[in-house]
Amino acid sequence: MQSKMSVMTVLPKGKHTATIIFSHGLGDSAAGWYPFAQALAPRFKHVKWVLPTAPIQPVTLNGGMPMNSWFDIRTLTPTNSSQEDERGLLASVRTISDLVAAEVDAGIPANRIVVGGFSQGAVVSLAVGATLERKLAGLISLSGFLILADKIKSMQVDHAPSYPVFWGHGTGDPVVRYQWGEMSVQKLREVGWKNIQFESYPGMQHTLGAKEQQDVEAWLKKILPGEQ
């Protein structure tokens, strides 16, 4: 069950003109990605970072153990949507969409907001981008994958395929296999997503690598430039 969500923020050092909402992976929390946001913040003085923590709920993959999770996961292999927690995913999509709405209400245009995440958080971020009526600046998927793949074409809003997407994945990932990442990108391309920058990192496992962080920074500089 979704409960009140805790959020960590890294405030901009300059005038706030853009926001990045970044969601963690299974069993993690906002605190796990706070150093990532802090590391990039000095290069993006106009950006506010919003780091939500998922609610605690039982996870089938881990024997029903309760942990921070955006939705239930039954398996970490590609499957059909009948085996996937569509209800849980869409509940988390609403949660992240509410964070987007809060930023818009505070004066940040949707096209100056990037939504991204790692692993399970990336899944939610992709689903937010696919379904949100507001058009965002772009999406980030780190070690992510696509669920409800057989429904994505019917679920997505008209502008979703135009999104710039940064997608990074390690070839040595033992949790979310690199091939699943490739398959997910291919599925999105099949339904019209043509602006996906897919970067592979030889030998990298289920983590954030230094080169990947540099690539995310370079991509963000193009997508969320500061005031000239």
Regions found by a protein language model. Give the residues of each.
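Conserved alpha/beta-hydrolase "acid-adjacent" motif
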Residues: A31, P174-W180, G209
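Primarily recognizes the serine-hydrolase "nucleophile elbow" in alpha/beta-hydrolase
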Residues: V104-D158
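Short beta-strand/loop motif that positions the catalytic acidic residue
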Residues: F166-H169, D173
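Short, proline-enriched alpha-helix->beta-strand connector loops that line the catalytic pocket
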Residues: A160-V165, K194
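Short, conserved loop/helix-junction motifs that constitute active-site signature segments
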Residues: A41-F44, M155-S162
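C-terminal catalytic histidine-bearing segment of alpha/beta-hydrolase fold enzymes
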Residues: E182-Q228
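Serine-hydrolase catalytic machinery in alpha/beta-hydrolase-like enzymes
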Residues: Q2-R112
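Short alpha-helix in the alpha/beta-hydrolase fold that links the catalytic acid
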Residues: P35-A37, K153, R177-K187
